[in-house]
């Protein structure tokens, strides 16, 4: 969030359209809350995984398991199953070559960096539902984007649409978590 503001100020960009997916969507949402004067608009895509109260404990436990797998099995091994997860089925079906490239690039990520991110960012971040008071006061025009098969993000994204006064919601059919890669022309 602060990194986005710093880059804009450093480049003397007074206001920008800011787009983020997944963890980047979460950063974009927080940017809109903390620095509305710097944002022309926001696109918040695939945000809110792990936010639903009834699933929060399992989400945190899964984050620990995945972090350990990154450390013990290595990124290449974990990427084999992570890239093929249920929220990427449509990506593989629509664009097998693009999906294979995604999986290859995922396998090249730092295992240590990924483990630290799971524990220190993903697991530690608050639920979007905990931000309700702030979100109700948000003034930046915001488009919430989600794939209809990105199950962990559907309820949080609907909540964002209902809570942020300036928000619109775009649900892409037959799309999972990687909506930017699955539907690049939109």
Task: Place the predicted regions along the sequence by residue.
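Conserved acidic catalytic loop of the alpha/beta-hydrolase fold
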Residues: 1-16
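Short beta-strand immediately N-terminal to the catalytic nucleophile in serine-hydrolase-like folds
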Residues: 18-20, 45
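Gly/Ala-rich beta-loop-alpha elbow adjacent to hydrolase catalytic centers
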Residues: 20, 24, 28
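Flexible "cap/lid" loop of the alpha/beta hydrolase fold
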Residues: 29-34, 38-73, 77
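Conserved alpha/beta-hydrolase catalytic His-Asp/Glu region
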Residues: 54-58, 72-134
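Short beta-strand/loop motif that positions the catalytic acidic residue
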Residues: 138, 144-146
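Conserved alpha/beta-hydrolase "acid-adjacent" motif
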Residues: 151-156
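Catalytic histidine-centered segment of alpha/beta-hydrolase-like enzymes
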Residues: 175-185
